[in-house]
Amino acid sequence: MSFLELKSVEVYYDDVPAIRGVSLKIEKGELVSIIGANGAGKTTTLNTISGLLQPRPGEIWFEDKRIDTLPAHRVADRGIVQIPEGRRLFPLMTVLENLKIGAYSPCAKGDYRRTLQDVFNLLPLLKERRNQIAHTLSGGEQQMLAIGRGLMGKPRLLMLDEPSLGLAPILVRAVFETVKKIKSQGTTVLLVEQNVRHSLELAHRGYVMENGRITLEGTGLEVLNNSHVKSAYLGI
């Protein structure tokens, strides 16, 4: 079985279907990208993996164990970390305090100092700004803090939801360079992103989601070069 596997997952808001029959796989060490328009079901998929939503029907397996019946905090304890869209920082806390909150799971608490140093090595700006209040950071700096906070949880699977949203092009490049470094360290990554070209160029494999369904899958370059993807998402 794959590192993470979704089997025919369906999620409803009341009686309205949000995702329908979603099946996808991620192997250990892969970076997998899900692309799609607003409302396609991408964030719902991440929230369901995280245990914030319950599939009905469908199954989610992580490291050969079924997790779709677990509450969200138990899913997080297994090493699944989600960095939400919009960063969701604690704005009146310092950078360091936000990072500490990321290390709440038992395994992360036990290795806090080493993990903090690893995060500072990856994102040296956070070390420089560690005593600065989070809401005074720029948008790009706040996104780096959100990524750093996620890494403090020592993720076995790191899920990023629209990390480049609302950022200037130069900051978008910086965010994707950071994701590339995380990938190179062997962390398994599930990336939801509307910046189609950047995300698929970086991905081992990609999925296209439309109207709550997976409509296309392949290697990152296969999906990027697909004629429908070029027309619908790249304007080519």
Where are the language model's segments positioned?
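Helix-to-loop junction immediately C-terminal to a conserved catalytic motif
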Residues: 50
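Conserved ABC ATPase signature
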Residues: 133-137, 141
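ABC-type ATPase nucleotide-binding domains, specifically the catalytic core motifs of the NBD
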Residues: 14, 32, 70, 95-114, ...
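The feature captures the beta-strand-to-loop junction immediately N-terminal to the Walker
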Residues: 35-37
